[in-house]
């Protein structure tokens, strides 16, 4: 089983690129301050790297 990491949305997606909004939605984040636990896979890591200026990773 893959390890879990916590991701928190710290900035708004308003006015951001549509691809970046899609990454945030793909991570399961809905609103500022929302934290989700996701599996630590290469695809999830790629989404986090793409929107690193919007999210904060807590489980490293």
Curated annotation (Swiss-Prot):
Molecular function, one GO term: structural constituent of ribosome
InterPro entries linked: Ribo_uL30_ferredoxin-like_sf, Ribosomal_uL30_bac-type, Ribosomal_uL30_ferredoxin-like
GO BP field: translation
Domain of life: Bacteria
Cellular component terms (Gene Ontology): cytosolic large ribosomal subunit
Signal sequence, renumbered to the chain: none
UniProt-recorded name of the protein: Large ribosomal subunit protein uL30
């Amino acid at each position: 089983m893959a390890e879990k990491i916590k991701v928190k949305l710290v900035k708004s997606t308003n006015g951001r690129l549509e691809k970046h909004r899609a990454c945030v939605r793909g991570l399961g984040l809905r609103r500022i301050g929302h934290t989700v636990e996701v599996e630590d896979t290469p695809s999830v890591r790629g989404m986090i790297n793409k929107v690193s200026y919007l999210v904060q990773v807590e489980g490293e």
